[in-house]
């Protein structure tokens, strides 16, 4: 696929999703059955309306059955499924119904709350529609078929995805909102995080714990002793995930994270990638200065490369109450961020250090334990 975007001055090639792969392979199968000739490429319309020419391999066919595969090409976006083969088997039937299912390497939903029903193959609605339309268009209205999508590497590749968090077990998902993979785009990642959040809400949860990643997750479970069932990753997308909790009408949010990550939010930085915004030292220096810290401490903190290193200086100087001040600012900024949209969301914050453990909370820790057990 020769289509490109530019990001930070560099040129990146776009690719296509597992859903587009499955639609192309399914269409190739139908064409081989109907023409009794091998098909090496097919033209498909993606879920987003883009027309692509997709190469096909591993072709086999007989009078009523065919198999074909398409290799996932994520362009310059090397994700967990890049380069793997998506196989499709199509068998004509005596009915007019077209039935789609997943086989080996395609995950199955085991929990409510996502866009796939419990027990069904993890083929999301948009690619499912696209696959069925591709087959129906080639097959016509008066024939039926059974379609099986499978991926021999799927179970292993799924270990590098968020599927287990979503209750999808046994393989990958067939995905694709637009059918096109856009390199350097965070949209797919954000969508996965939203899906997990939506699943929790659909299960009846009204309060949620947002963590930036594994450190936060581990701290919540093993230091605070809170249930893992309430935890969802927000990664670097703090603002986006806060907006999502509001959209889904969660009543309470507890943000738990390493101080070096969450300190940015106190200054209104809601996307916390270091490449986008790294003002940790500046924020610490400003808050220490407001507390009357001596110039010598401010100068030393400014030189620190990490908040862990700064923490040692802050502790020695007796200014650890700066953590409480900043935690309250994280809470205030976050609530202000959601202020002009309903419903309102109550937000609390817990920050910690790898070396020093719990640093600050916006509510007494025993009260938080009562609320979140």
From Swiss-Prot:
Name this polypeptide is given: Cobalt-precorrin-5B C(1)-methyltransferase
Keywords tagged on the record: Cobalamin biosynthesis, Methyltransferase, S-adenosyl-L-methionine, Transferase
Alphabetized GO MF terms: cobalt-precorrin-5B C1-methyltransferase activity
Transmembrane segments: none
Taxonomic placement: Bacteria, Bacillati, Bacillota, Bacilli, Bacillales
Enzyme class: transferase
PANTHER family reported in the protein's UniProt record: COBALT-PRECORRIN-5B C(1)-METHYLTRANSFERASE
Pathway the protein contributes to: Cofactor biosynthesis; adenosylcobalamin biosynthesis; cob(II)yrinate a,c-diamide from sirohydrochlorin (anaerobic route): step 6/10
């Amino acid at each position: 696929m020769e289509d490109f975007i530019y990001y930070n001055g560099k040129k990146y090639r776009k690719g296509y999703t597992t859903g587009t792969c499955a639609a192309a392979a399914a269409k190739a199968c139908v064409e081989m059955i109907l023409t009794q000739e091998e098909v090496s490429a097919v033209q498909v319309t993606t879920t987003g309306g883009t027309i692509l020419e997709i190469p096909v391999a591993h072709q086999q066919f007989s009078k009523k059955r065919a198999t074909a595969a398409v290799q996932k090409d994520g362009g310059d976006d090397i994700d967990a499924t890049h380069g793997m083969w998506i196989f499709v088997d199509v068998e004509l039937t005596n009915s007019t119904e077209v039935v789609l299912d997943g086989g080996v390497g395609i995950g199955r939903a085991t929990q409510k709350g996502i866009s796939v029903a419990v027990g069904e193959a993890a083929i999301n609605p948009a690619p499912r529609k696209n696959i069925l339309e591709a087959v129906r268009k080639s097959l016509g209205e008066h024939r039926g078929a059974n379609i099986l999508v499978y991926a021999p590497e799927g179970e292993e590749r799924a270990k590098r995805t968020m599927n287990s968090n979503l209750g999808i077990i046994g393989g990958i998902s067939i995905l694709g909102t637009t059918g096109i993979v856009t390199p350097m785009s965070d949209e797919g990642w954000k969508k996965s995080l939203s899906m997990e959040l939506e699943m929790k809400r659909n299960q009846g949860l009204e309060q949620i714990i947002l963590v930036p990643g594994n450190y936060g997750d581990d701290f919540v479970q093993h230091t605070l002793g809170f249930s893992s069932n309430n935890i969802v990753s927000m990664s670097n997308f703090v603002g986006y995930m806060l907006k999502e909790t509001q959209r889904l009408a969660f009543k309470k949010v507890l943000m738990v994270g390493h101080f070096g990550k969450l300190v940015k939010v106190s200054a209104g930085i809601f996307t916390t990638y270091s490449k986008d915004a790294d003002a940790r030292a500046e924020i610490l220096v400003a808050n220490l200065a407001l507390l009357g810290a001596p110039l010598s401490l401010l100068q030393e903190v400014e030189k620190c490369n990490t908040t862990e290193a700064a923490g040692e200086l802050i502790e020695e100087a007796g200014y650890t109450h700066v953590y409480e001040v900043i935690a309250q600012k994280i809470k205030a900024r976050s609530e202000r961020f959601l202020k002009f949209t309903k419903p309102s969301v109550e937000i609390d914050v817990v920050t910690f250090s790898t070396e020093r453990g719990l640093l600050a909370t916006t509510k007494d820790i025993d009260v938080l334990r009562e609320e979140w057990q």
